[in-house]
Amino acid sequence: MQTLIQGAGAFIWPLGFCSFLALFLIIERALALRVSKVAPESVVKSVLTGQPELVGAADGESVAGRLVQRWKDGASGEVLKAWARHELIRLQRGLHLLDSIVAGAPLLGLLGTVAGRAALFPEQGLPDTVTLTRGVGLALSTTMIGLCVAIPSLLATNWLARRLEILSSRLDVLVEALEARRR
């Protein structure tokens, strides 16, 4: 492992930063996109059973609770849907950075590969053994680390996007139920 990190040279810093940022974003978004934080069962059940009045101030901490509060304050129709879209945009926070890491980490690895290959060809003659080893090590290490950052980030991004889609569907049902109640 130490050889891999040393072989990556200066490219280890941006790749390490991408790795830590991705880990932070994955954990933070996984915690933020829990059902209990977005659309708790108690709030959804109260609305779907035709009793949104039972949703209390304590439920206002969740996205669904805030939407019910807006409905109680008189928001309806397009206004309520606009608030739901606003909340969904807030839930997407940070996912664009994770997408950038998925795309950028392999490119940083590729840049390291190019730098390693460039080191193989000195201005004159053939490279010596040390230069050859260092260049190949840089090329392989940065590629491997870039992929090791990107692949788990890609899997997490897909999981979070699916999670967001499911929660969005729950909120759509909630808004439609509130709208039907208003009519």
Language-model features: where?
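Hydrophobic membrane-targeting segments
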Residues: 1-42
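Membrane-interfacial hairpin junctions
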Residues: 3, 121-135
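Residue-level signature of catalytic and energy-coupling elements of molecular machines
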Residues: 9, 23, 68, 109, ...
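Alpha-helical transmembrane segments of integral membrane proteins
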Residues: 12-25, 99-106, 149-153
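Transmembrane alpha-helix boundary/anchor motif
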Residues: 21, 25, 31, 112-116, ...
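Predominantly long cytosolic amphipathic alpha-helical stalk/bundle segments
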Residues: 36-127, 158-183
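Pore-lining and gate-forming transmembrane alpha-helices of multi-pass membrane transport proteins
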Residues: 130, 134-157, 161
